[in-house]
Amino acid sequence: MDRVTRYPILGIPQAHRGTGLVLDGDTSYTYHLVCTGPEASGWGQDEPQTWPTDYKAQQGVLRQGVSYSVRAYPGQPSPRGLHLETGEDEGLKVYRLGARDAHQGRPTWAVHPEDGEDEEMKTYRLDAGDAVPRGLCDLERERWAIIQGQAVRKSGTVATLQAAPDHGDPRTPGPPRSTPLEENVVDREQIDFLAARQQFLSLEQANKEVPHSSPARGTPAGPSPGVSQAPKAFNKPHLVNGHVVPTKPQGKGVFREENKVRAVPAWASVQVADDPGSLAPVESPGTPKETPIEREIRLAQEREADLREQRGLRRAADHQELVEIPSRPLLTKVSLITAPRRERGRPSLYVQRDMVQETQREEDHRREGLHVGRASTPDWVSEDPQPGLRRALSSDSILSPDSILSPAPDARAADPAPEVRKVNRIPPDAYQPYLSPGTPQLEPSAFGAFSKPSGLSTVDTEAATSPKATMSPRHLSESSGKPMSTKQEPWKLPRGSPQANRGVVRWEYFRLRPLQFRAPDEPQQAQVPHVWGWEVAGAPALRLQKSQSSDLLERERESVLRREREVAEERRNALFPEVFSPTPDESCDQNSRSSSQASGITGSYSVSESPFFSPIRLHSSLAWTVEDPVDSAPPGQRKKEQWYAGINPSDGINSEVLEAIRVTRHKNTMAERWESRIYASEEDD
């Protein structure tokens, strides 16, 4: 078989008889059995047939050459088939090469009939004792058979029976002998490649003019070049272990399961079956034959279509797979001076195409209504058609103004822009420590920052106390019929806000409140999950997915803000320790911020309302009076109190515990001696 074109070099296109070598029930290959007996004495009806005495070479031919018939090169005598052409009239004959006469100590081959099944089968004895002296012609032919067996084996497509690499001696049905038959099979001559090429070309010509199936001849032509016909599963039971069963004498037969299985190894029972039905089903001559690779591709596509059908996904149209990859315009590159060279920063076209396709797929997912749990369960169908959701772009495109000013065209076509669009990026919990629960939420237009509606104050109080009569987040989402993740220009005032309030600055924004951190005493009421406009009440909930990058950005921003608060507090404590140190009733553990941090309650600090407002809370009503704490050390020795692991350092017991569990630096003895200035060891003295 040619490695490139996959044409069988050694196959005969019009083989009158196929050798049915069945490995599995639905294999569909045509096998030709090789016979290299002497040319002079063919298979007579009753005369014995002579086999060459060196059976090892024969075994090699039998093993390797089973799948391809030997085709003699021009000028060589062609080997005979296993049966005469004249014997066609006497019905089907199934020959079985048995290995029964091994006890006689000589390589005797017998063709055994099945015991009583078909009376018309006759027994033929082949004995090596009455071998005619072999002439030069026979040796020559044998050499050719071996060479071609090697050529077949080298192409790597030989079907080895039972998939075992070596099957021992054909005479002994017992455990296979371990003697390698390589030294006999190895050919030490060159293959005549010119002749092989000639033969290949003539084969190709023959295959071109022979139609794919010739009904006049009983059997289909050998598989035409590069064809693996898709095997149709036979509707009969699988065969036992490679044995093919004698078929009924009418021309169209099928394999039957064999009841009596001989103890012969399966590779030895090679049989000749004369029925066209046992071979691979022939496709109609109109259909173009496909190569194995094409077949794999077709099967994969069918599997994919099946899966799409099961999951309820539409078939991807071809125009969806075509992607516009943004590339630099050609005219900017045209310069007569510089030689064109590859841009280093850009990925290859394939990578770019994959990236663009991936983002397209994600956006389509989001636009179809964020089916997270739904894609794999198509049986749940919503009662009303879902309105198209806006395409939520990734976070970096939200931050670029041009993408905000011009939303995606298809989304704009889907439904007109609602009155107010909000971007919720930074939640007010970030500013929450500086606000009290009664104060209104910060508006994004006032501060130029993004904000998210907080759960601490209810919608009604927020709508009542808010200085601008903007719509509450819930009304906003209902009026627009869209999720909260849609975009708004943060630098423009919401269009719904009344004009009168625009210049008013409320003093609450600039009122400084004492920083007091305490965990909320009662857990916040669990809010009823809000049903968006596109959701059906009984349906499985669809979560709005936050893109991973925005989540990371939010987390990073929170940590930065938290760190800034801590640094500011430490700086205040360092500069004015007496002014800012907490009053004794506040210094207990459950009010301290770090202890609540250590206990895992973070991020939910409500800030207590104080009856009076002043820049900072002082110890006395006189501002900036420094009172010495009673137990203070002289100020030179006062060291900055540092919190460690959420433990209050002014607490004596805690510090004792800290001292007890502190890890001292382990030094080995040499290091200790070095630090105690003992430089020389005792041996040196």
Curated annotation (Swiss-Prot):
Keywords, sorted A to Z: Actin-binding, Cell cycle, Cell division, Cell junction, Coiled coil, Cytoplasm, Cytoskeleton, Mitosis, Phosphoprotein
Gene Ontology MF annotations: actin filament binding
Biased composition (Basic and acidic residues): 355-371
Positions of modified residues (Phosphoserine): 78, 214, 284, 348, 382, 394-395, 397, 406, 436, 477, 547, 549, 581, 592, 681
Gene Ontology BP annotations: cell division; cell migration; establishment of centrosome localization; establishment of mitotic spindle orientation; mitotic spindle assembly; organelle localization; regulation of protein localization to cell cortex
Residue ranges, compositional bias (Polar residues): 454-469, 478-488, 589-607
Superkingdom as given in the UniProt entry: Eukaryota
Low complexity biased stretches: 392-417
Subunit structure: Associates with F-actin. Interacts with DCTN1; this interaction regulates DCTN1 distribution at the cell cortex. Interacts with PTK2/FAK and MAPRE1.
PANTHER family listed in its UniProt record: MITOTIC INTERACTOR AND SUBSTRATE OF PLK1, MITOTIC INTERACTOR AND SUBSTRATE OF PLK1 MISP FAMILY MEMBER
Function text: Plays a role in mitotic spindle orientation and mitotic progression. Regulates the distribution of dynactin at the cell cortex in a PLK1-dependent manner, thus stabilizing cortical and astral microtubule attachments required for proper mitotic spindle positioning. May link microtubules to the actin cytospkeleton and focal adhesions. May be required for directed cell migration and centrosome orientation. May also be necessary for proper stacking of the Golgi apparatus.
Name the record gives this protein: Mitotic interactor and substrate of PLK1
Organism field: Pongo abelii (Sumatran orangutan)
Lineage: Eukaryota, Metazoa, Chordata, Craniata, Vertebrata
Gene behind the chain: MISP
